[in-house]
Amino acid sequence: MIRVAAAGGGTGGHLYPLLAILETLSKDVETKVLFFAVKGKIDEKVVKQEHPEYEVVTLDVRGLFRPLYHPKNFWRAAKVVNAILKAKKELLRFKPDVIVLTGGYISGVVGLAAKNMGVPIFLHEQNVVPGLAVKTVAKYARKIFVSFERTREFLTEWKDRVLFTGCPVRETKEEVDLEDFVLVLGGSLGSDLINSLMEEVYRRISCIRFVHSTGSRRWAERLSVFPNVTAHPYIENMSSFWKKARASISRAGASTIGEMIYYGVPGVLIPWEGSAESHQLENALEAERLGYAIVVREKEATPQKIIEAIDKTMKKGKIEKMKENPATIISREILGEIR
């Protein structure tokens, strides 16, 4: 048995790749998991619901305001110090064999708590441009796994420890009884911009089938009036839809792009330009450069522009699926390092 301490949360983009890694590790070897979650956030809720066998410890932390010298950061920094002390106490009690971190401010807290404990730390960065937490903890990491080759440019100081894997994906054996549709996603909380844009698109297009995860029951009911649209407030078994999708329309969160690339589904990306450190825009532009996507900026997003992008994307056709799930590669690398 190996004892794994893990953190990566605050958003689904950090959480789901981490769960993919942990679930794959548990298939390869017996594990006991200590999971650090952000109090009141998605990681606490999802992990307690889906993995009651994990020991969950919540930390009361929030991300820092930008710029970092923002006056409100004084109070947040005090919370960070308390969270580091709590995390260190829990780590000393749990005695992990390995620590797996996938970004978000809680990863920075746990990484700093563990830096002098002699336990191997493994990082995964989902975004093209590494976040503050990953850059803070990188110097203490045994290996840094990345979703994009270009991320190496931002981690040159630790280039010997960087390994390009892609973004870990949670897979399911479930199948959906649908074929030849466009998958529309707005992220784990939905997107009013995408929902309202697509409502106008649906008024104009009836010859294409859409499956739309809206993020809210209200929007799902509103969009279900269109006969060619299957709308859900939230899709649980996302991978079963990715497997059958012909194209996609979404924000540009790293885990969404990771799924898009893994399953070989070309996409129309509308990056949220308010994301921290312009992560979504950078992710979208890199996916476009690699030939996986067409980027439509928020200020240029009109129903007609989206229709034109859908047409180009569907003509492109599906791309070859990745041969191996990045979660499998990462699990193999971790076990190879600690055995």
Swiss-Prot record:
It comes from Thermotoga neapolitana (strain ATCC 49049 / DSM 4359 / NBRC 107923 / NS-E). InterPro entries: GlcNAc_MurG, Glyco_trans_28_C, GlycoTrans_28_N. PANTHER family: GLYCOSYLTRANSFERASE, UDP-N-ACETYLGLUCOSAMINE--N-ACETYLMURAMYL-(PENTAPEPTIDE) PYROPHOSPHORYL-UNDECAPRENOL N-ACETYLGLUCOSAMINE TRANSFERASE 1. The keyword Glycosyltransferase applies. Pathway: Cell wall biogenesis; peptidoglycan biosynthesis. GO terms for cellular component: plasma membrane. SUPFAM superfamilies: UDP-Glycosyltransferase/glycogen phosphorylase. This is UDP-N-acetylglucosamine--N-acetylmuramyl-(pentapeptide) pyrophosphoryl-undecaprenol N-acetylglucosamine transferase. The keyword Glycosyltransferase applies.
